[in-house]
Swiss-Prot record:
Pfam families named among the record's database cross-references: Claudin_2
Glycosylated residues (UniProt): 41
Membrane protein topology class: Multi-pass membrane protein
PTM comment text: N-glycosylated.
Compartments where found: Membrane; Endoplasmic reticulum
Gene name as annotated: TMEM235
Family note: Belongs to the PMP-22/EMP/MP20 family.
Name this polypeptide is given: Transmembrane protein 235
Region forming the signal peptide: 1-28
InterPro entries: PMP22/EMP/MP20/Claudin, TMEM114/TMEM235
Length: 223
């Protein structure tokens, strides 16, 4: 039973850490980083690179020293007269800001289910909760993957609008917010695997009350 307790404790801690990482990722503004290279020592605007560089999250973008401004609300952009490619970007952004917060809610529900199944010592509930966490990790993975696709398409749309010559000194990368989301996804899958292992361990363990041997049954019958 010590092995079972260790598996359940590790799964609970993994789920809590997964929630914390994903919550920090969703709330932070370092998913996508855009850095502009310096124009050279002879530039008439020495601080140009810092002013044009930016980093953004799911909800807002921060540009240089100008502070952060909210991104365009994808749910309020249906009536805008934009191109098909921009409409596709809006749909992707809408999917991201729905899927990832939904993953947070599902993590809370999964943690509650895991607590109940641990207290009940039920194999079927542990199996259900383990599969639940694995499916939740797939949902988180889908949200992160959609964001990656959204970011690549948004940069390609920007290059198409302004021309490649204006984007030569621009370097884009994903920030630590993305790393937190990947870590949350991995921990969620890890917790689900631990719960499945706990269900398997519990199914192999003998009942707590034990079974009487035939000699014990005969002895009690004689009494």
């Amino acid at each position: 039973m010590a092995r079972l307790g260790a598996l359940l404790l590790a799964a609970a801690l993994g789920a809590l850490l997964s929630f914390a990482l994903l919550a920090a990722a969703v709330a932070s503004d370092y998913w996508y980083i855009l850095e502009v290279a310096d124009a050279g020592n002879g530039s008439a605007w020495p601080g140009r690179a810092e002013l044009l560089s930016s980093h953004s999250g799911l909800w807002r973008i921060c540009e240089g020293q100008n502070g952060c401004i909210p991104l365009v609300d994808p749910f309020a952009s249906e009536s805008l007269d934009v191109s098909t490619s921009v409409q596709h970007l809006i749909l992707l952004h809408r999917a991201v800001i729905v899927v990832l917060p939904l993953s947070l809610v599902l993590l809370v529900c999964g943690w509650i289910c895991g607590l109940l199944s641990s207290l009940a010592q039920s194999v079927s509930l542990l199996l259900f909760t383990g599969c639940y966490f694995l499916l939740g990790s797939v949902l988180t993975l889908a949200g992160v993957s959609i964001y990656i696709s959204y970011s690549h398409l948004a940069f390609a749309e920007t290059v198409q609008q302004y021309g490649p010559q204006h984007m030569q000194g621009v370097r884009v990368s994903f920030g630590w917010s993305m790393a937190l989301a990947w870590g949350s996804c991995a921990l969620e899958a890890f917790s689900g695997t631990l719960l499945l292992s706990a269900a398997w361990t519990l199914s192999l363990s003998p009942p707590i009350c034990g079974h009487l041997s035939p000699q014990q049954v005969g002895g009690r019958g004689g009494d």
